[in-house]
Amino acid sequence: MKKYQQLAEQLREQIASGIWQPGDRLPSLRDQVALSGMSFMTVSHAYQLLESQGYIIARPQSGYYVAPQAIKMPKAPVIPVTRDEAVDINTYIFDMLQASRDPSVVPFASAFPDPRLFPLQQLNRSLAQVSKTATAMSVIENLPPGNAELRQAIARRYALQGITISPDEIVITAGALEALNLSLQAVTEPGDWVIVENPCFYGALQALERLRLKALSVATDVKEGIDLQALELALQEYPVKACWLMTNSQNPLGFTLTPQKKAQLVALLNQYNVTLIEDDVYSELYFGREKPLPAKAWDRHDGVLHCSSFSKCLVPGFRIGWVAAGKHARKIQRLQLMSTLSTSSPMQLALVDYLSTRRYDAHLRRLRRQLAERKQRAWQALLRYLPAEVKIHHNDSGYFLWLELPEPLDAGELSLAALTHHISIAPGKMFSTGENWSRFFRFNTAWQWGEREEQAVKQLGKLIQERL
């Protein structure tokens, strides 16, 4: 158990025994450092863990307090990735999120594209327009499964790819992450086994931990994607209930599965009666002539829950996503009503208004062109300034590059050193519970390139060279 986990466990026991009562203010981070003798970062991570588990709450400018229901809560177990490994990615996630909030830090670690790429003025006009015409009934009309016009517009976009999905099968959510979490809840129970890629989007690992599910990480190649032979071995050995994968522009590696492999994947999971939860948030960010099909296109047995959003291609702040849920649509609606209740009504209406202008596809074409140009420029800068021993894995979609450091360098240590120079990168351990990706890091190429970015890459090259 890590030090921050030990401290969190100690505080949990104190809360359970009544030493700290609901509503009590906990010692400040600095006071806890003095009391425990641990580092500021360790204490921060312990408090973050307790907050994520619902034991404490943070109040701005005030501190941390014991949550009202904390004493009644059962202890939340850590989840094994194998029989003897536990998820431990909070340190890296915390550092990345903290760094991304600081405008002085070059955000190569960010998961989002540059917001200046989005048509914010047009979207704001749409939001202003619907604010004038919204009625009291608008809130009711936009309760789960969501705005009917928006669901119809999404269904039409599926139809453009030859995929028939009824608007009644679509549930609008507060971003793709809610769609993915609700999908996971709909098909699993605590203690079930779920397959994820290795490496995978860190939100998947957090979701499994929160829902008390067991994770099986399956080997995933930087170009070819998930190893289907390894996947079948896992399906044979464990009673797997769901499989959470990205098939297009995978985060963090960047690959897109071939049509043949998508078909094989769907057939294999159907053979073992395992639901595929398809995370497809980057599907619009392709650089080729045709949009890649999701695995959902090969689904003939209603075994794929296809999740996506407008966050990575249109507007992150609106937090509008969806799941094509098929037979699980009503259950997902019920789960949503018990959690977030519904997705923002004004945001749904504004998106319907914007999509009605038919500017969306023109925006997407422009966005893809700009992302491709920026990715090429960043790649060239990395080739120019980084030592030749560093391998740069490049895929023709999305806005991530996956970099491999030579042995014995550690990307986690490099990321901390880079932060002292106001540069953020996303270390490989953020995306896995094991140590096999410790020499890798993800690099965001979507931000506008200028002298600051050029100098940041140059400094990154110096830091790597010093460690060779």
Curated annotation (Swiss-Prot):
Show the coiled coil region(s): none
Ordered alphabetically, the record's keywords are: Aminotransferase, DNA-binding, Pyridoxal phosphate, Transcription, Transcription regulation, Transferase
Top-level taxon in the UniProt lineage? Bacteria
Q: Name one GO biological process term.
A: alpha-amino acid metabolic process
Q: Which GO terms describe its molecular function?
A: DNA binding; DNA-binding transcription factor activity; pyridoxal phosphate binding; transaminase activity
Pfam families, alphabetized: Aminotran_1_2, GntR
Name all HTH gntR-type domain ranges: 1-69
SUPFAM superfamilies in the cross-refs: PLP-dependent transferases, Winged helix' DNA-binding domain
Annotated positions of the N6-(pyridoxal phosphate)lysine modification: K312
| Cited CDD domains | AAT_like (cd00609), WHTH_GntR (cd07377)
Keyword set includes Oxidoreductase: no
| Similarity-based family | In the C-terminal section; belongs to the class-I pyridoxal-phosphate-dependent aminotransferase family.
Check the record and name the PANTHER family matching this protein: HTH-TYPE TRANSCRIPTIONAL REGULATORY PROTEIN GABR, TRANSCRIPTIONAL REGULATORY PROTEIN
Q: Give the protein name, as stated in the record.
A: Uncharacterized HTH-type transcriptional regulator YdcR
Species the sequence originates in: Escherichia coli (strain K12)
| Encoding gene (name) | ydcR
